[in-house]
């Protein structure tokens, strides 16, 4: 008799895990604490809420995340189905309307006959049965304590949320439309240019601004991919200009040259009524954010629909605790999925949920478990999370540095394309194993 699977957490990983298990004929109970209880960063009542940004990053196979998305498309991922159905213009990236995305995933999950959505907080891990723990980086207190006892120890760090401004409060005489190097439709981003004097004054204010301080018992460890702007600014006056404010590839059509620095605004929803400040995650106090970000040309009268904030991310030491199948080494009926495993990013979380969901279903049906090939993006990420050195483990985005080397000498400009080609060819050969 096939066992029922319990999935804890209705985020990207949990929904993907539940969907993949149900697709394979296994009954799933998916627990989600919203709307009865919200974390400090969540606001929508639906499943698969996107918190940090509405961007799913680059779509080109030149980027490993682009390959990961293509693999998930071919694997019939619910995450990618929802993303394609709710996407908004974003140059060479894939971005979604976060409200529509959550609504889409919620509808698909709730309408599946083998998935029961239970709206209540889980405070104890079931002692029997197959469990997928996908409680996310903002795991609630009692469940976090449970995981701590189960795992022996857990790590934590902060990442940050970027502000959103109302489109009708932007001064379009000062901002110009362009995508870096003309990618996408060429005008998917709004760009607020700064000259050298404006940039230097802006950086000085950020460095001197009042910040939200962490509690005394919390050690701050920032993930490089979601670094607060004030942390970057403190590293040197030019750091922001080589980070989120880099002007390279953005020519102001009014003067015909690249500005000294640029703040990019990305469309947040389909109606184009909201724009987020790209890469401007921050832990500045809210009054300081309003004051300093209104120094940006074009945002002098900005209406902030959401201000930046900080939240804690909880993740386990996956190389120490997990098998490549996403199973807990010490109790193999328990699977972990999503950011709590140390993958970083929306697409990566869904990828982790895919592997956990497939394997949980196979375990429930008495079949052998699978490990995606290391030559694929989904496999390279899974291998890194479970095989890297445990003593120096940190959250990781998918990138081509995680992939096995290509044989022989390969020209640098050809390497990424060949890695992507090999990855997709390997995936196609692996698909029959999932049947």
UniProtKB/Swiss-Prot annotation:
Compartment list: Cytoplasm
Swiss-Prot/TrEMBL cofactor(s): FAD
Keyword terms of this UniProt record: Cytoplasm, FAD, Flavoprotein, Methyltransferase, NAD, NADP, Transferase, tRNA processing
Gene Ontology CC terms, in alphabetical order: cytosol
Record-listed E.C. numbers: 2.1.1.74
GO molecular-function terms, A-Z: flavin adenine dinucleotide binding; tRNA (uracil(54)-C5)-methyltransferase activity, 5,10-methylenetetrahydrofolate-dependent
Taxonomic superkingdom: Bacteria
The family this protein is said to belong to: Belongs to the MnmG family. TrmFO subfamily.
Name this polypeptide is given: Methylenetetrahydrofolate--tRNA-(uracil-5-)-methyltransferase TrmFO
Biological classification of the source: Bacteria, Pseudomonadati, Thermodesulfobacteriota, Desulfuromonadia, Geobacterales
């Amino acid at each position: 008799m096939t066992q029922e699977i319990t999935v804890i957490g209705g985020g990207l990983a949990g929904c993907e895990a539940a969907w993949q298990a149900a697709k394979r004929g296994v009954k799933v109970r998916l627990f989600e604490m919203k709307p009865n209880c919200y974390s400090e960063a969540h606001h929508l009542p639906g499943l698969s809420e996107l918190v940090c940004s509405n961007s799913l990053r680059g779509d080109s196979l030149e980027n490993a995340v682009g390959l990961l998305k293509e693999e998930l498309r071919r694997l019939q991922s619910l995450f990618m189905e929802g993303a394609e159905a709710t996407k908004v213009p974003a140059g060479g990236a894939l971005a979604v309307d976060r409200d529509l995305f959550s609504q889409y995933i919620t509808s698909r999950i709730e309408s599946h006959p083998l998935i029961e959505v239970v709206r209540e907080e889980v405070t104890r891990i079931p002692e029997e049965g197959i469990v997928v723990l996908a409680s996310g980086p903002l795991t609630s207190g009692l469940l976090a304590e449970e995981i701590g006892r189960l795992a022996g120890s857990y790590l934590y760090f902060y990442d940050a949320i970027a502000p959103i401004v109302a489109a009708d409060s932007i001064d379009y005489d000062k901002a110009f439309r362009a995508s870096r190097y003309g990618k996408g439709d060429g005008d998917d981003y709004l760009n607020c240019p700064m000259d050298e004097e404006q940039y230097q004054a802006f950086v000085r204010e950020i460095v001197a601004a009042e910040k939200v301080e962490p509690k005394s018992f919390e050690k701050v460890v920032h993930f490089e991919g979601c670094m607060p702007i004030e942390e970057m600014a403190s590293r040197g006056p030019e750091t922001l200009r080589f980070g989120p404010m880099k002007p390279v590839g953005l020519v102001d059509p009014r003067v015909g040259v690249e500005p000294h620095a640029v703040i990019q605004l990305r469309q947040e929803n389909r109606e184009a009524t909201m724009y987020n400040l790209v890469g401007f995650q921050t832990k500045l106090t809210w009054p300081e954010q309003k004051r300093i970000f209104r120094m940006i040309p074009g945002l002098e009268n900005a209406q902030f629909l959401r201000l930046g904030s900080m939240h804690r991310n909880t993740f386990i030491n996956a190389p120490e605790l997990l098998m490549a199948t996403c199973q807990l080494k010490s109790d193999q009926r328990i699977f972990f999925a999503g950011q709590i495993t140390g993958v970083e990013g929306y697409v990566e979380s869904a990828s982790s949920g895919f592997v956990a969901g497939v394997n949980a279903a196979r375990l429930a049906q008495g079949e052998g478990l699978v490990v995606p090939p290391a030559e694929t993006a989904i496999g390279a990420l899974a291998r890194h999370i479970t095989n890297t050195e445990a003593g120096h483990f940190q959250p990781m985005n998918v990138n081509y540095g995680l992939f096995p080397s290509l044989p022989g000498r390969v020209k640098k400009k050809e390497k990424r394309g060949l890695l992507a080609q090999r990855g997709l060819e390997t995936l196609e050969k692996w698909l029959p194993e999932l049947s």
